[in-house]
């Protein structure tokens, strides 16, 4: 197979932080006093990456593929990310790389980086994954510990079969 085209996607997500919910990033449960409010598990990192991947493939957004229905209530967003990779693969795309930033000040996230990266590399089927953490420097809803947000950019490659019969 030979590369035909490369496409860039961008994704973003944010959720309020509330009592009684878990804080999950890329399937990793974070020890935090508040959790992310959302229809699924509220995993803003996985959601931002899903939107970036779907954007790169011109396939809509997370709500197009995983609507707020009973089927996806409290869904594991890492599983949704794996499903998104399958959706892309079925259309001839593969993930080249992902770079993401999570903004939150409720808890220090760097101790979770290696497990988050391990989960993402497995789900995305690429070793070219990077995640950064920012505090918000006391500004905005992330800096005031009222919410969490994530940004992601990705590069996907569309493969064309060049084998001759």
UniProtKB/Swiss-Prot annotation:
Organism: Thermotoga neapolitana (strain ATCC 49049 / DSM 4359 / NBRC 107923 / NS-E)
Catalytic reaction equation(s): 4-CDP-2-C-methyl-D-erythritol 2-phosphate = 2-C-methyl-D-erythritol 2,4-cyclic diphosphate + CMP
NCBIfam families recorded: ispF
SUPFAM superfamilies in the cross-refs: IpsF-like
Cofactor: a divalent metal cation
Subunit relationships: Homotrimer.
Keywords: Isoprene biosynthesis, Lyase, Metal-binding
Gene name of this polypeptide: ispF
Superkingdom of source: Bacteria
Residues with site note (Transition state stabilizer): 39, 135
Functional summary from the UniProt entry: Involved in the biosynthesis of isopentenyl diphosphate (IPP) and dimethylallyl diphosphate (DMAPP), two major building blocks of isoprenoid compounds. Catalyzes the conversion of 4-diphosphocytidyl-2-C-methyl-D-erythritol 2-phosphate (CDP-ME2P) to 2-C-methyl-D-erythritol 2,4-cyclodiphosphate (ME-CPP) with a corresponding release of cytidine 5-monophosphate (CMP).
Listed EC numbers: 4.6.1.12
Binding locations of 4-CDP-2-C-methyl-D-erythritol 2-phosphate: 13-15, 39-40, 61-63, 141
Pathway: Isoprenoid biosynthesis; isopentenyl diphosphate biosynthesis via DXP pathway; isopentenyl diphosphate from 1-deoxy-D-xylulose 5-phosphate: step 4/6
Name used for this protein in its record: 2-C-methyl-D-erythritol 2,4-cyclodiphosphate synthase
Keyword set includes Secreted: no
